[in-house]
Swiss-Prot record:
Gene: rps12
GO biological process: translation
Record family assignment: Belongs to the universal ribosomal protein uS12 family.
Protein's name in the database: Small ribosomal subunit protein uS12
Entry keyword annotation includes Ribosomal protein: yes
InterPro entries associated with the record: NA-bd_OB-fold, Ribosomal_uS12, Ribosomal_uS12_arc, Ribosomal_uS12_euk/arc
Source organism of this protein record: Methanosarcina acetivorans (strain ATCC 35395 / DSM 2834 / JCM 12185 / C2A)
Length: 142
């Protein structure tokens, strides 16, 4: 390692080169996390419901978590989104427009006992899913 009076440039260049050994730095600078994200770095996204699916919970829990397959409008990618709330999936029909957001798992992954599900539904036809579940609003008829 350079220690002389005019060593600053060499030290700077060494730091620059060493940065690339850090996986997270490389992914961030090259934009790979945004490229791999179905929402493209956005906080939320709209999509069309293709079908309702039941996802089996991981051990030691035993349940069928109600989810929907959604095709995003912005890029056509398909994602599975969890429907939070008691009876929430009954308010969602095929071909409805839903708004999805990330579910909040660590490092952008799945949360809790729902394997492979990284998104959750927050609105159906521009009406909050939570409001529908508690009965405060009705779903608009198309």
């Amino acid at each position: 390692m350079a220690k002389g009076k005019y060593a600053a440039n060499i030290l700077k260049q060494t730091r620059k080169d060493a940065r690339w050994k850090d996986t997270y730095y490389g992914r961030r600078v090259l934009g790979l996390n945004v490229k791999a994200d179905p929402l493209g770095g956005a906080p939320q996204g709209r999509g069309i419901v293709l079908e309702k699916v039941g996802v089996e919970a991981k051990q030691p829990n035993s349940a069928i978590r109600k989810c929907v397959r959604v095709q995003l409008i912005k890029n056509g990618r398909q994602v599975t989104a969890f429907c939070p709330g008691d009876g929430a999936v009954n308010f969602i029909d095929e071909h409805d427009e839903v708004t999805v957001e990330k579910i909040g798992g660590r490092m952008g992954g799945a949360m809790g006992d729902i394997p492979g599900v990284r998104f959750k539904v927050i609105a159906v036809n521009n009406v909050s899913l939570n409001q529908l579940v508690i009965g405060r609003m009705e779903k608009p008829r198309r």
